[in-house]
Amino acid sequence: YHYKDYKSDYAISNVFQKNGFFPGAHGIPDISRLQDDGDSRNIELPFSQVNHLKFTTHHQYAWESILLSGDFGYQNNHREEWSAFHTHYGTQPLPEKDPDKELAFMLHTFSSSVKLRLFGSPSWEHTAGWDSQYQQNSISGYSFLLPEYHRFSTGLLWLTTYRPNNTFSVSGGIRYDYGTIHISAHEDNYLATYLEGQGYD
């Protein structure tokens, strides 16, 4: 979209992929799975599937000696691994919902970046910027690999460039960043019971 001194771009994409694991390389070994069923497109357990959704937008407004721009985006990464329910601990029951979902991760990412460029003279250029990102990861499945977490980061910057001619330039700047992350604790009661049965405290 372009109107006078303002222009913007928008992009969206979605990628889906489903891959089977080599029989016997994951989950419960089963000799029957080594037999060819005649269907080259048939993906049975165990398998993994990934869906990646991304939306980005860029905005820019220019007037006189000032250029203001911003980039904003959202990403959703959803990964699942499916395998016939199996466990190393005899006390772990079959899940009531999605009993064959071994692992699942749902990562949401929100990002933004804003920059203000000032052209004070033909030789001097100043840039002020701010960017931030927020992530939230949730999990499910009867196995555990990565924890749930919330992550936030942000930063401010100032950059100055001196360009006396077309062959020489000097740049200097400063940046400040701040970030936090909260990782949820994960307790595996079935593992604890198993270890206690093995004599561990």
Across the structure, where does each feature detected by a protein language model lie?
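Outer-membrane beta-barrel proteins, especially TonB-dependent receptors
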Residues: 1-201
